[in-house]
Amino acid sequence: MERRRSERVKVNLKAERISGDERYAVFIENISEHGIHLITASSHAHKKYSPGKELELKLQLPTGEKINLLCKTQWAYSRIPPEKVTDSIGLEIIDPPLQYIKFVRALHQSS
């Protein structure tokens, strides 16, 4: 049974995970209107990204424009590609802003 509310689109976008005064670079691999799959350098993901934990993401669009997103971690695990270890995290977007939804819908139309 499919649990996602909307279809995902593969992307290659930069973002920042914001935690208080600290910022962490992350890369977004795919998105939907209500979710994001991101990867980041391995750094104890299960502590920073434990399921249910809320976090803020600042997503940079290809135009250079930035969108702030409040998200909730759904899952996190480490993966080991041939070159390096990364953390893979699934996020649910809490109340996605209209600007973000329009961006995702435009991606669907162009793919």
Predicted regions located by residue number:
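N-terminal helix initiation/capping motif
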Residues: 1-44, 105-111
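Short conserved beta-strand and strand-loop elements enriched in small hydrophobics
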Residues: 13-18, 50-66
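Short beta-strand-centered aromatic/proline hotspots
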Residues: 25-28, 69-76
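Short beta-strands and strand-coil junctions in structured, solvent-facing domains, enriched
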Residues: 44-46, 79
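Extended Gly/Ser/Thr-rich low-complexity repeat segments
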Residues: 47-59, 101-111
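C-terminal output/interaction extensions
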Residues: 81-111
